[in-house]
Structure formats: structure tokens, C-alpha cells
């Protein structure tokens, strides 16, 4: 959530920044300033009314002590009128704050200066390309055919048990999943991230804190009886560990990693791009989260990008890194880098990680703050990234490591799988 100061300091600049995300924010900004002016005026009137009420209440006792009962009764009536007025003002102030809050939360985060202009994924900037292609057999198979051939992932059984987008991993397919999760977590903990195991259901406050609510409720599975949401990413529960927390400057950086199954409705997804593991309703993902001092957050982002790259590189997959354009960025992000691995069998790039700096946007919603050197309370910065998302990594491994003998396992994973080939 943007702060009032960010909007009021230069409303024209705020509108220009949000236009980069494809948002015509000028009308909303004018409403926000108007709502804020009303809130300030009501707050001032309420403060003055309460001050007059307190002063008059004190005068009643003095008048009674002097035997001036008639004047004291008059002051009592005056205080009663002020109490009625203050109650009315408090109700109006509550409404004004809610109007202001609703308007502010409708605006996305400002994009960073280096975010490219653009509206769609076609406008994203390729900042690195590593073409470590493996030699594939003639007419390589896509992963969904390999999964059927080696009986390691059963998509039809998932449909029987739940529905489309809920595959069942079997035998070496299940062991490969478990191996990847453990490998990713080990890579992250070796890099200084604290492993946590959070709940996979969160409340509304947690969804609001990281920006999934009210923006993405249509994409989340909602347990209406308890008003809980299944997590679309471990970012939500892990970042919310520090909701309503004030840290000391020396506590930074805070680095956490977690594995969770993730749940996304993906409403409206259809066509060839959703075949097999390309787009699922339930999938496994390992996440990294950092809390940073504002002046250190872009340095932290660079470190997270380098860390994710080291994992992708160790798997020996062809990959590229993209800097997302304004129109393709998330509601909450200030700057995002996507990692994609190449599928030779599908002839397309598959996203396997998204690493983002949210600056103070999430922290403002979370009330995640710290004390600076002068003991003033400031907003922290939050960052997170997939390290990594499993479905498309599994798809890329199956497709890029297929041979006439079977599917080879990258050397880095063999200690985790206990086997070097699927056949």
C-alpha cells in the first residue's frame, strides 16, 4: 500500500509512475487527496471539540466547589452537547478513514525507475541468456508424454481424485519431487536463510498484508466456513510472520525460506500452454523471503537473483533472466526479475521463478517497521522469490534430460534422488 506522503508529495509524478503499470491513477489520486483533506479537517474539529469538552468538564467541579450550582448545571449541558458532537465527529472520521483506505489500497505499487515501458510479456527485457542446451534425441517428447511413458506422473488419476490441474506423482516421479524440494531448501539454508514451515491456510489479515487481498481473491481457494484462504505462495504466511512487528536496525537482514504446496484457481486458463505441468491448481514451491533496510533492498534483490541463478545453473538447464515491464508486473512489485527455462520439446520458455522487491508497499500494509538511528519508526522493505517452483522445473528436467535410454538426472540431484536415471 502506498503512503499518503508518496501520493501527496508530487501527485503528477505519482500518476506518471502508475501509468507505467497501465493504470490511469489521476482520478483516484484526486479522490485520495480530497478524502485526506476531509479526514484532516474532521480530525482537527474532533480534537478541538474534545479539548473544549475536557476543559468544560474540569470547570464543572470548580464551579460546584464555589457553590455556583446554576453555572455548573449550564456547563454540564454544554459538555453533553459536546459529547454528542464528538460522537458524531468520530463516526464521520471513521467513515472518512475507510473511504481513504479503500481508495489507497486500489492503487498498485510504484514501479522502479529501471522498469521497462510496456504492456505485455512481449515487452519484457531479456537481461541474460544462457544456452546450455543438452543433446536431445530426434523428435523429443513433451513432459506429459514422458510422464506417461515412464509412469511417473498420472494426470488422469488426478482428475479422478480431484479435477484437472491436480496431478499424482508416482514412484521415481514422487522421489524426484521430494529430492528437488530438499535440494532447494538445502541451497537456501546454506545461503543463510532460516527454514520455516508455515501453515498453508491464512486469514484475511495475512492475505491483505502481502497484497493478495483484495486484489486476487478470485484466484485463491477460500474456505468460507472459517474464512481462511489456501496459500497461493509461501510468501504470504512467511512474510506475515513479521506483521505488526517493530524491528531494531541491527536485526536486518531477515532471511527466511519455506516449502509449501501452493493453490491457485487460475480461472480462465486454457489451451496448449496449460498442458501437463505447465499450469496447475496445486503445485510445490520453495520460497525465499527477505526483510531489508530501505537503503539495502536493491542490493538484497541482486543477491537473491544471483542465488536463484546459481540453483538453475546447477541443474544444467538453458535459462534466461527477464526484467519485467510495467504492464506485466504484479500489483505489489516495484521491480521483478523472472527466470525462464527452455523447453526444446515444447519450443517455448517456461517461467520457474519470479524475484521481486516490493520496497515499503507490503510493509505499510503489514505495519512492519523498524527503529532507525534516531529511534524514529520507519517502514522496512520486503522482497521474495521462488527458489524454485517445481512443476515447470520438473517439466524442463524431463524434457531436457531425455535420452533413448531414459531420463538422466542432473549430477547435483543424484545424492537427493538416490538414482541417476528414470527408465
Which residues fall in each region the model found?
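N-terminal alpha-helical targeting/anchoring segments
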Residues: 1-134, 148, 152, 156
Amino acid at each position: 500500500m502506498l503512503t499518503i506522503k508518496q501520493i501527496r508529495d508530487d501527485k503528477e509524478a505519482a500518476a506518471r509512475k502508475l501509468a507505467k503499470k497501465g493504470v490511469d491513477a489521476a482520478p483516484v489520486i484526486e479522490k485520495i487527496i480530497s478524502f485526506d483533506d476531509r479526514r484532516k479537517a474532521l480530525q482537527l474539529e474532533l480534537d478541538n471539540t474534545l479539548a473544549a469538552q475536557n476543559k468544560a468538564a474540569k470547570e464543572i467541579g470548580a464551579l460546584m466547589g464555589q457553590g455556583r450550582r446554576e453555572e455548573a448545571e449550564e456547563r454540564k449541558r454544554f459538555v453533553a452537547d459536546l459529547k454528542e458532537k464528538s460522537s458524531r465527529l468520530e463516526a464521520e472520521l471513521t467513515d472518512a478513514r475507510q473511504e481513504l483506505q479503500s481508495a489507497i489500497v486500489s492503487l498498485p505499487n510504484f514501479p522502479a525507475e529501471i522498469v521497462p515501458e510496456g504492456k505485455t510479456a512481449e515487452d519484457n527485457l531479456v537481461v541474460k541468456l544462457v544456452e546450455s542446451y543438452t543433446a536431445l534425441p530426434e523428435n523429443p517428447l513433451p513432459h506429459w508424454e514422458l510422464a506417461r511413458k515412464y509412469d511417473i506422473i498420472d494426470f488422469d488419476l488426478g482428475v479422478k481424485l480431484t479435477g484437472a490441474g491436480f496431478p499424482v506423482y508416482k514412484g521415481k516421479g514422487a522421489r524426484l519431487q521430494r529430492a528437488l524440494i530438499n535440494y532447494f531448501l538445502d541451497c537456501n539454508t546454506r545461503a543463510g536463510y532460516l527454514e520455516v514451515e508455515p501453515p498453508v491456510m491464512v486469514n484475511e489479515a495475512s492475505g491483505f498484508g502481502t497484497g493478495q487481498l483484495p486484489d486476487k481473491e478470485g484466484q485463491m481457494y477460500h474456505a468460507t466456513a472459517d474464512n481462511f484462504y489456501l496459500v497461493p505462495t509461501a510468501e504470504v504466511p512467511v512474510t506475515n510472520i513479521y506483521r505488526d512487528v517493530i524491528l531494531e536496525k541491527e536485526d536486518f537482514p531477515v532471511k527466511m525460506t519455506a516449502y509449501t504446496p501452493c493453490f491457485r484457481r487460475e480461472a480462465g486458463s486454457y489451451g496448449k500452454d496449460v498442458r501437463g505441468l505447465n499450469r496447475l491448481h496445486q503445485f510445490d514451491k520453495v520460497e525465499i523471503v527477505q526483510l531489508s533496510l530501505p537503503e539495502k533492498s536493491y542490493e538484497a534483490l541482486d543477491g537473491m537473483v544471483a542465488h536463484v541463478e546459481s540453483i538453475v545453473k546447477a541443474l544444467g538447464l538453458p535459462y534466461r533472466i527477464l526484467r519485467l515491464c510495467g504492464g506485466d508486473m504484479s500489483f505489489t512489485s516495484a521491480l521483478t526479475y523472472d527466470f525462464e527455462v527452455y523447453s526444446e520439446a515444447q519450443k517455448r520458455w517456461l517461467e520457474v521463478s519470479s524475484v521481486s522487491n516490493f520496497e515499503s508497499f507490503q510493509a505499510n500494509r503489514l505495519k512492519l517497521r523498524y527503529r532507525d538511528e534516531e529511534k524514529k519508526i520507519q517502514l522496512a522493505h520486503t522482497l521474495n522469490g521462488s527458489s524454485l517452483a517445481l512443476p515447470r522445473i520438473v517439466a524442463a528436467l524431463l524434457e531436457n534430460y531425455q535420452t533413448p535410454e531414459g531420463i538422466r538426472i542432473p549430477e547435483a540431484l543424484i545424492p537427493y534422488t538416490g538414482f541417476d536415471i528414470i527408465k
